[in-house]
């Protein structure tokens, strides 16, 4: 299925590219999220007339993400959790806990933006957590996990 991308999408293309994707991916993900439109003749003409406006929107989103990245990079968050001997936590600290702690500290982060490639945190200590604010913008959050009294 031919679609026109309205945003930069990793491993697929950037704004304005006409790409061929599977029908289900287009129908269930790209089109409902406003990241693409079907490549009909009318949509191609509509896109060409709105191209400057869409490029400005993408640039604005990128600038906003970079501004948030500056705040996240400067942020240090501490989470207290119950733990046993040798620093093992009872339970774990996941993406939702990290997002809520960062939001409480003053920087709005969604749990879908938190990247934990090795899974949830299960020990006390200092961690650097990757935050993906935009397809091109990553930030690093300094996280300290301490034992709760």
Curated annotation (Swiss-Prot):
InterPro entries (UniProt xref): Ribosomal_bL9 (IPR000244), Ribosomal_bL9/RNase_H1_N (IPR009027), Ribosomal_bL9_bac/chp (IPR020594), Ribosomal_bL9_C (IPR020069), Ribosomal_bL9_C_sf (IPR036791), Ribosomal_bL9_N (IPR020070), Ribosomal_bL9_N_sf (IPR036935)
Pfam families from the UniProt entry: Ribosomal_L9_C (PF03948), Ribosomal_L9_N (PF01281)
GO molecular function: rRNA binding; structural constituent of ribosome
Keywords for this protein: Ribonucleoprotein, Ribosomal protein, RNA-binding, rRNA-binding
Gene Ontology biological process terms from the UniProt entry: translation
Superkingdom of origin: Bacteria
GO cellular component, as recorded: ribonucleoprotein complex; ribosome
HAMAP family according to UniProt: Ribosomal_bL9
Function summary: Binds to the 23S rRNA.
Record family assignment: Belongs to the bacterial ribosomal protein bL9 family.
Protein name (record): Large ribosomal subunit protein bL9
Species of provenance: Aliivibrio fischeri (strain ATCC 700601 / ES114) (Vibrio fischeri)
Gene: rplI
């Amino acid at each position: 299925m031919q679609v026109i991308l309205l945003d930069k999408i990793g491993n697929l293309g950037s704004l304005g590219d006409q790409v061929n994707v599977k029908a289900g991916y287009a129908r269930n993900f790209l089109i409902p999220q406003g990241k693409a439109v079907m490549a009909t003749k009318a949509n191609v003409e509509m896109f060409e007339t709105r191209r400057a406006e869409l490029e400005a929107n993408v640039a604005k989103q990128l600038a906003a993400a970079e501004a948030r990245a500056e705040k996240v990079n400067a942020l240090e968050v501490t989470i207290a959790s119950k733990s046993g001997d040798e620093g093992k936590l009872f339970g774990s600290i996941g993406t939702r806990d990290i997002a809520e702690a960062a939001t409480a500290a003053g920087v709005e982060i969604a749990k879908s933006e938190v990247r934990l490639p090795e899974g949830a945190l299960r020990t006390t200590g200092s961690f650097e957590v990757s935050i993906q604010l935009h397809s091109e913008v990553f930030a690093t959050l300094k996280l300290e996990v301490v034992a709760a009294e």
